[in-house]
Amino acid sequence: MSFSLGELAASLGATVQGDAGLIVKSIAPLDQAGADQLAFLSNPLYLNQAVSSGAGAIIVSPRDLETLESQGHAAGRNWLIAANPYAAFARVAQRFVALAARPVVPGIHRTASVEEGARVPASCSIGPNVTIEAGAVLGERVRIAGNSFVGADARIGDDTLLYANVSIYHGCVVGARCVLHSGVVIGADGFGFAPDFGPQGGEWVKIPQVGRAVIGDDVEIGANTAIDRGAMADTVVEQGCKIDNQVQIAHNVHVGAYTVIAGCAAISGSTKIGRYCIIGGAANFAGHLTIADRVTVSGGTSITKSITKPGGHFTSVFPFMPHGDWERNAAIVRGLTRMRERLQQLEQRVKDLQQQS
């Protein structure tokens, strides 16, 4: 399980400075890599680690290599030069993982339940205790691990992987080459209840959720994330999105292509997130908002209004500090209204005095 440095460079569209025949057996961090390993430098803050690294070769940008050469640290080393070292590292890592991957054996486990009318190609691998209901359609080479559920009339595209205990509800769509980690639920009912209360009490009346959840191609969804089905129209996650663990996407949300959402974020119903957005962990969005393309939202931020200008970076988190300092600042914040009123009174007195003079 190894590659020559030249092979890796060719697969990346990169170039080699040094020994293209060097055999690379694995990847490792700069400060841990050995002579048969490949490391990467994607941040100039770690230039010193690159200098002292024992790696057989290092993925580096042209700019950082130029810096190392100017300092006299590049000679006699092996460099794989790529415009985006971090992305190059990711692609190399994929190649090594593919080499070591457990072979996929097509077939349906004897304990799986595949109802009549479901379409499961012979190239699929269906694990133990999987349930596939009537009308469900799987693409080629779909892999479904144990205890997962695919509801009636659901659709799953080619080469998609469902880890154990994933649930795809009836009528929902998952695209090609997707990865859904354990505990993901696609298409559960959205949180829709109409209040019907009077003087004598009443109840919350459930609104049937008759839309679908539609997931595009090349989407990865982390463990225990829920994407609810739409109330009437569909909930949509477009192609290329990457969603972390424990994210809640409510009914009728629309997430634009190639947006990334970190863990524990929550997006309320009917909010539309643009393309190429970056959503930090535990960020939360009110419902019925529109967020422009390429917007970045810091972790823990609460978004309560639409963002119409593309490309901004938004933060609402109060920075951490020692607890005693936080208590003092909180006390000041509580008194801001009173301070504002006093300031307005003082301003008025100054105006009155100026007029008298």
From Swiss-Prot:
GO terms for cellular component: membrane. The keyword Transferase applies. It catalyses: a UDP-3-O-[(3R)-3-hydroxyacyl]-alpha-D-glucosamine + a (3R)-hydroxyacyl-[ACP] = a UDP-2-N,3-O-bis[(3R)-3-hydroxyacyl]-alpha-D-glucosamine + holo-[ACP] + H(+). One of its GO terms (molecular function) is N-acyltransferase activity. Keywords: Acyltransferase, Lipid A biosynthesis, Lipid biosynthesis, Lipid metabolism, Repeat, Transferase. The active site is at H251 (proton acceptor). PROSITE patterns: HEXAPEP_TRANSFERASES. Gene3D superfamilies: Hexapeptide repeat proteins, MurE/MurF, N-terminal domain. CDD domains: LbH_LpxD. The keyword Transferase applies. Pathway: Bacterial outer membrane biogenesis; LPS lipid A biosynthesis. GO terms for biological process: lipid A biosynthetic process. It comes from the Bacteria. Its EC number is 2.3.1.191. Signal peptide: none annotated. HAMAP family: LpxD (MF_00523). Catalyzes the N-acylation of UDP-3-O-acylglucosamine using 3-hydroxyacyl-ACP as the acyl donor. Is involved in the biosynthesis of lipid A, a phosphorylated glycolipid that anchors the lipopolysaccharide to the outer membrane of the cell. Belongs to the transferase hexapeptide repeat family. LpxD subfamily. Homotrimer. This is UDP-3-O-acylglucosamine N-acyltransferase. It comes from Ralstonia pickettii (strain 12J). The gene is lpxD.
